[in-house]
A protein has these predicted regions:
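A short, internal acetyl-CoA/4′-phosphopantetheine-binding micro-motif in the GNAT/acyltransferase core
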Residues: 85-93
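Active-site rim helix/loop that mediates acceptor-substrate recognition in acyltransferases
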Residues: 15, 22, 26-64, 69-70
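Short acidic (Asp/Glu) patches
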Residues: 66, 101, 105, 133-137
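A short beta-loop-alpha structural element at the N-terminal edge
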Residues: 2-16
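Conserved active-site alpha-helix within GNAT-family acetyltransferase domains
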Residues: 111-115, 120-145
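A short, polar/charged loop-to-alpha-helix boundary motif
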Residues: 69-78
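C-terminal "cap" of GNAT-fold acetyltransferases
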Residues: 140-156
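Conserved acetyl-CoA pyrophosphate-binding loop and the N-cap/start of the following alpha-helix
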Residues: 92, 96-104, 114
Length: 156
């Protein structure tokens, strides 16, 4: 098993893997592969936190991060991270690969000086990694909503 930074020549394989993993998962079809494609063009994309996982020379996992901000009610801004899509090929899910890839990426983020990650994700998938509901940190959307899927992890 190898974790390395994604390269341009990986993009198509990664997008096909994302499509396979998310197809018809929570709604008909999916758009996560297109989202990953677009994120790579964003000025907030962090190439140093764009990882693939290989097993026997085949890409089986992927995660990418973007810069984000939290705006406090007093106007102060905190620079944070968000990630997604986070994907493990369906044939390799529930075998510990996701945990290894996520932990590797979180350590790399911490090494770069980041201390907070905020994501939209299924709590059943992320609570075991230390992500907690946003309400615990008084982090909400602009309209004071605290969605269950808005989750926070402090990097310690």
């Amino acid at each position: 098993m190898l974790i390395r930074n994604e390269r341009f020549e990986d993009y198509r394989v990664v997008e096909e893997m994302i499509k396979k993993a998310f197809w018809n998962l929570s709604e008909p079809g999916c758009n996560e592969h297109y989202f990953a494609h677009q994120v790579r063009k964003s000025e907030d994309f962090i190439p140093e936190l764009d990882f693939v996982m290989e097993e026997d020379g085949q890409v089986i996992g992927h995660i990418l991060y973007v810069k984000a901000k939290l705006l406090a009610t007093d106007g102060t801004v905190k620079n944070i991270l968000s990630f997604g899509p986070f994907t493990i090929h369906p044939d390799y899910q529930r075998k510990g690969y996701g945990r290894k890839l996520l932990n590797h990426s979180l350590e790399a983020a911490k090494d770069m000086g980041y201390d907070t990650v905020v994501i939209f994700g299924n709590p059943e998938n992320y609570a075991c990694y230390g992500f907690k509901n946003c309400k615990r940190y008084n982090i909400c959307l602009e309209n004071n909503l605290y969605p269950v899927a808005l989750m926070v992890k402090e990097l310690e």
